[in-house]
Amino acid sequence: MKVYAVLRGFPGLGRVIAGFELLKHLENKFNAIVKVSTYLQGDSYINTKGYTSSIEIDEKDISSVGVISVSKSGEKLMEDIVSFNPDIVIIDGEPIFLQNLKISYPNLYIVSLLNPFDVNNPYNQKSSQDFFSYMYSFADLSIVHGLWEEQKPNNFKDYLSVNSIIRDSIPTISFSEKSNSIVCLLGGGSKTVNSGFTYGTIEIAKQVIDIASFNENFDFTIYTSDKDIKNKIINYLKYKELSVENIRIIDSISDEREIYTNARLVIARAGRNTISELLTMNMPSIIIPTTANFRGSEQLCNCRKIESFNFQNIKTHHLDSGAEDLNHKMHKLFNTSVDIKNEVFIPGNLKAIEKILAIMKKKSPGNSIALSTNIN
């Protein structure tokens, strides 16, 4: 089995992590021969896992919705896929490239990984939603994964809607309820987004800095994966003339075990993947949406879903409630039992892999892949 993955490397890492996990799983458990192409933060992420992008994508060939398929980089990417002759092409977040690839090479089997908002986004303008939906419909199989399920659009082909696909390592991570370490996750980045999204991300950091200043017995680590955001946070500290010795700011992509293992509590931007990881670990957490057009609206929907789960260990916070309220919620979570297990949210990895393997078996009836193989 040969699998090629094309993963959009912005605005954060959500588009990269899921596809990359499926790719690694197929490689490690089923001896698939794999290739991956990504860019921006995506390239940095797979480098930390020992992989390199097969094609280097020129930044000028990237649009707000992914690789420009008729650019030099887009053409090189198509040629690389075709020469590899994969059984399956996994594409996440590249509607224009996906459509062009299927038009030019209709016999390629394309699996599209989608966010529920890719399928149904009431906050997006109708013309944009119709445009993206039409492009995504060219995929042979659409796997929609997130915090809720979405109904299959009429124009889509084979379809699966599941909970978020997360990193395989996440269920094995144990956090420390007795540590003094507080982690702030500002997402995988803020590339090609509007100023409101970046502003909201920085505002989360500001409130964390404020509560750090009067919680000196705790160490706060802010992970951003974005040097521009780190610089803005440092400028805020200078402007406020704050010398907060219990704060570290990390602007590089860090291993998930390093981030979570010693944390007592996580304060995080309300992205789909981060929330899904926290739910899976049952990590005491506070989820904060940014304040920005449709991306902010998506994060608000994520928060509403969290509230509907009514988990004692995971709470939401809104920036206009202020740092004092954030501090109150943090200390309240310190007194919440971590023994309460999450039996509501089960990651979608298993169902997604089963679906892909079933397709492979159907495409090649003589294939030796056994669906009964342990794929956990």
Regions found by a protein language model. Give the residues of each.
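Conserved nucleotide-sugar phosphate-binding/catalytic loop shared by glycosyltransferases and other
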Residues: Y4-P11, H25-E79, L237, V244-N246
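A short, glycine/small-residue-rich beta-strand->loop->alpha-helix junction that serves as a flexible
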Residues: L7-F20, S190-Y199
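Short N-terminal targeting/anchoring amphipathic segment
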Residues: M78-P95
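A donor-sugar binding/catalytic signature common to diverse glycosyltransferases
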Residues: I90-G93, D255-E298
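A nucleotide-sugar donor-handling region in carbohydrate enzymes
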Residues: N120-T192, Y223-S225
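Donor-nucleotide binding loops and adjacent catalytic segments primarily
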Residues: R167, S176-N262
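Nucleotide-sugar donor-binding patch of glycosyltransferase catalytic domains
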Residues: P284-D325
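C-terminal amphipathic helix plus adjacent low-complexity
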Residues: K332-N376
